[in-house]
Amino acid sequence: MRSGLLPPGLNESDAESNSEDEATLENSGLNLQEDKEDESIRKTEIIDFSTDEPKTETESNVNAYEECPSGIPIDMWNKFQELHKKHSEQKSTTSRFRGKRRKRSRKDKLKNEKELHSEPSSNETQWKELTQYFGVNDRFDPPVKRKKVEKSGLEKRIDQAVEEWNIEKAEELSNQLATRELGVKIAKAVACHNFVKAKKEVENSQAARKKKKLAWGFEAKKRWETKSNMGYM
């Protein structure tokens, strides 16, 4: 009971009910504040737990390998730890070795590409030498009007395939004919190249012989001149 006068229109029972309501409101406000504080504490705990999760997992794994479980002898556990360490070391060494091999393979590939681009291959040089002699002897062939053109069996088969509208067969036969003609050209070019090479060798040998003969002849002529001059003296 509160001491003092009550305001008009209120009884003691009304005052008691109002005091009880005020007490419940105060208690509810305190409960809300406590709930908010609990929620903030829980959030901070969750954040801390999420940040500490990987550490705890790694620590638990390390402890699992370091601590000897119950029911296993210590000697066996020590052997297991040694094997585990060796296995991890082998993994690290193999990963390093693979990285070095990849770097070396890349360097080798770059070197090979540079060599291919910088230096022409021997096949290309030989091909260039042969292409110089393609069609060299064509001028000695008779003209087309006078020459009797006789088709080969392959050409006749191509004409037959074209008449039958068998395009795939005609293309295949035409490729065979092209390779045959190219082979004939290459054979002629090789023969011409060999002929030119042999001719140059003969010319060089003849020139060397002539030089030797001229040298001996000049010396003999000089001796004869000296002898003749001595006879007149």
Swiss-Prot record:
Compositionally biased intervals (Basic and acidic residues): 39-58
Record protein name field: Protein FAM204A
Keyword Nucleotidyltransferase: no
UniProt gene name: FAM204A
Biased segments, Acidic residues type: 13-24
Keyword Coiled coil: yes
Parts forming coiled coils: 144-164
InterPro entries the UniProt entry points to: FAM204A
Organism taxonomic ancestry: Eukaryota, Metazoa, Chordata, Craniata, Vertebrata
The entry's keywords: Coiled coil
